[in-house]
């Protein structure tokens, strides 16, 4: 039987995500971001609730991406997630994309020319952002042209790189409905961005996601819920460059801007440049919020939930892969657990995210 991996945020889970799961074949394993996500934001609802949504709508097993995989640029995000899914025995990686390309062919190209392609990146001007450099690399070596406004396509190319040399088949699924960044409400498949933007519209939410009631009754957060804490962190941290990926230039820009702005969005607008994209700045600000420092990634895989089929699969691989199903006196990943504790500060109604939590079990055999 096919074992399909899916890398996701489900922020929040919507009809387009259900479509992706419906189109995927065989056993479906999701590697999902935890309480902070790749574009540099706190997840609107917590990881356990999002895992439950996925399991109730087609996923068989949901595992957590460690913080330093989940909150990273596309290449590191993809590489870390594929590493985890490979440990779980996937043979196919399914993903949504705005552009239908031969991603398996692109993966083969990268597998043969990785050294030359990486070397090419080092020859490009420093003023270019990493996404811009990546775009030029793919144009030169594979004739692929795209813009920075198609994040799912950018991730798909990162998946092609991450799967190079592995026995994992790439299965792109054409994205349905609104664009990733769209806030449009009239389309059949609304984007996660639109759902976050219009979360106070119950009728829109109800038609746009399969778990509307669970979403609407769950504690929700945005960056503004953490802005005061972020201000405190920036103002009291004597040397921001001690934190993960904060260089001297960014530290100066952030220290200066934090005294001039009154909202998180203003802060991002003030700090971002052509070189430092808004997504990168948001991720940097999360590192500062959490107090993140570079650390090694955990070798164990943390389980958020499973169905009966997912539990059976775990029993088959338990002697090959180290599984964490409950975090107690022994930590799983200290930085992820630190991030969870900060996440809980955003809303007093958020339940405990780490200690003693056990995987969600969904019986969908009927």
Curated annotation (Swiss-Prot):
Organism: Streptococcus mutans serotype c (strain ATCC 700610 / UA159)
Alphabetized UniProt keyword annotations: ATP-binding, Cytoplasm, Ligase, Nucleotide-binding, RNA-binding, tRNA processing, tRNA-binding
HAMAP family the record matches: TmcAL (MF_01539)
Gene Ontology CC annotations of this record: cytoplasm
InterPro entries: Rossmann-like_a/b/a_fold (IPR014729), tRNA(Met)_cyd_acetate_ligase (IPR008513)
Catalytic activity: cytidine(34) in elongator tRNA(Met) + acetate + ATP = N(4)-acetylcytidine(34) in elongator tRNA(Met) + AMP + diphosphate
Function: Catalyzes the formation of N(4)-acetylcytidine (ac(4)C) at the wobble position of elongator tRNA(Met), using acetate and ATP as substrates. First activates an acetate ion to form acetyladenylate (Ac-AMP) and then transfers the acetyl group to tRNA to form ac(4)C34.
Enzyme class: ligase
GO biological process: tRNA modification
Pfam families named among the record's database cross-references: HIGH_NTase1
GO molecular function: ATP binding; ligase activity, forming carbon-nitrogen bonds; tRNA binding
EC number of this enzyme: 6.3.4.-
Entry keyword tRNA-binding: yes
Transmembrane spans: none
Binding positions (ATP): 7-20, 96, 152, 175
Protein name (Swiss-Prot/TrEMBL): tRNA(Met) cytidine acetate ligase
Family indicated by similarity: Belongs to the TmcAL family.
Locations listed in the record: Cytoplasm
NCBIfam families, per database record: PRK13670.1 (NF010191)
Listed SUPFAM superfamilies: Nucleotidylyl transferase
């Amino acid at each position: 039987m096919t074992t399909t991996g899916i890398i996701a945020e489900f922020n929040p889970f919507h009809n387009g995500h259900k479509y992706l799961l419906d189109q995927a074949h065989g056993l479906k394993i999701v590697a999902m971001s935890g309480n902070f996500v790749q574009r540099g934001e706190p997840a609107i609802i917590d990881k356990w609730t999002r895992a439950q949504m996925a399991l109730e709508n087609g996923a068989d097993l949901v595992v957590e991406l460690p913080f330093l995989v989940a909150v990273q640029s596309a290449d590191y995000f993809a590489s870390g997630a594929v590493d985890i899914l490979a440990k779980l025995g996937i043979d196919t990686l399914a993903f949504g994309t705005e552009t239908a390309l031969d991603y398996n062919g692109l993966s083969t190209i990268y597998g043969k020319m990785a050294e030359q392609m990486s070397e090419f990146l080092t020859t490009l001007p420093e003023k270019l952002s990493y996404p811009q450099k990546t775009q030029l690399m793919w144009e030169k070596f594979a004739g692929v042209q795209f813009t920075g406004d198609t994040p799912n396509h950018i991730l798909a190319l990162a998946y092609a790189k991450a799967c190079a040399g592995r026995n994992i088949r790439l299965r792109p699924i054409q994205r349905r409905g609104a664009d990733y960044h769209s806030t449009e409400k009239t389309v059949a498949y609304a984007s996660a961005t639109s759902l976050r933007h219009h979360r106070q519209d119950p009728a829109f939410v109800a038609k746009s996601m399969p778990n509307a009631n669970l979403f609407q009754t769950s504690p929700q957060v945005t960056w503004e819920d953490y802005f005061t804490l972020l201000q405190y962190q920036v103002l009291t941290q004597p040397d921001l460059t001690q934190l993960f990926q904060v260089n001297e230039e960014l530290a100066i820009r952030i220290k200066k801007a934090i005294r001039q702005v009154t909202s998180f969005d203003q802060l991002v607008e003030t700090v971002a440049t052509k070189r430092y994209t808004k997504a990168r700045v948001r991720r940097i600000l999360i590192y500062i919020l959490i107090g993140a420092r570079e650390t090694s990634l955990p070798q164990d895989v943390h389980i958020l939930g499973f169905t009966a089929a997912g539990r059976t699969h775990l029993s088959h691989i338990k002697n090959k892969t180290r599984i964490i199903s409950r975090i107690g006196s022994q930590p799983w990943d200290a930085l992820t657990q630190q991030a969870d504790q900060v996440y809980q500060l955003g809303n007093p109604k958020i339940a405990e995210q780490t200690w003693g939590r056990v995987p969600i079990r969904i019986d969908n055999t009927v």
